[in-house]
Structure formats: C-alpha cells, structure tokens
Amino acid sequence: MAARGGKKEPPDAVHLNRLLYERVRKELRCQRLHTEHSINPLRPVHAVTQKPMSWHDNIEEPADARFLNIIHQAALEPTKKYSEPQTESQEIGWNTTPLTDVDRTDRRLFFPRRRTEITMHSAAGGHPKKQ
C-alpha cells in the first residue's frame, strides 16, 4: 500500500481479476431468480374499467340526437343562447355591432399602424438590421 500522498501503483491483471471475481460473487449472492408468479390472495383485486374517452369502445353505441343538441346548446356563447343579457357583466359588450361606420379615409378617427425607423428597430428586437 502506498503512503499517504504518495503515488499509487496501478493494479495488475491478477488483482483486477480478483476484484471482478469478488464483485460477481456478491452480485450472484444477492440476486434471486423468480420464475413462478402468482396473485397475492391477501391483497384486494381491483377491476380495471375501460377508458371513457376511447373511441374504439363506443363505436357501436348510437348517438342520441337530443342529448347532442343539449350539449351543443350549452357550449354556445351567451349572445346566441339568450335574447337579452342575464347578468350585469353580460351587459358590457352585449351589442357588438359598432354604432358608427368606420371611415378609413378619415384620419381623425382611424389610426393605422405606421412603419417608421423606431418601430422597425423595436420589431427587430432592439437590434438594427444591417443593410
């Protein structure tokens, strides 16, 4: 054995073989091969049900038209379901049609996006493009 802080001798082939033999012997001692399997009678068995959303299990079932109509009706937005708003929150934005027609030639009320040097600089992520 080398002294503390000294150089360690590299292991020779006999020493490496002895280490490998010892390792394999310990592994084989701890491993156990099971070839027969059975159900534990003391543990309760749970039944596995089918997946509810699987399409291949529900192919033969006919679709109920009334039920589908109820589902589709419930998924509609409130303006299509009801003639008037049902809550105070629904009153805001119930009428979605604009009160006046938008005149795109009138510059007082129409502000389109413009491309300037500053907007192109910020759209590029703050880095000016080299041209």
From Swiss-Prot:
Gene Ontology, cellular component aspect: axonemal microtubule; ciliary base; motile cilium
Top-rank taxon, per record: Eukaryota
Chief location: cytoplasm
Tissue-level expression: Expressed in choroid plexus (at protein level). Expressed by motile ciliated cells in choroid plexus.
InterPro entries tied to this protein: CFAP144
An example molecular function term from Gene Ontology annotations: microtubule binding
Keywords: Cell projection, Cilium, Cytoplasm, Cytoskeleton, Flagellum
Identification of the protein by name: Cilia- and flagella-associated protein 144
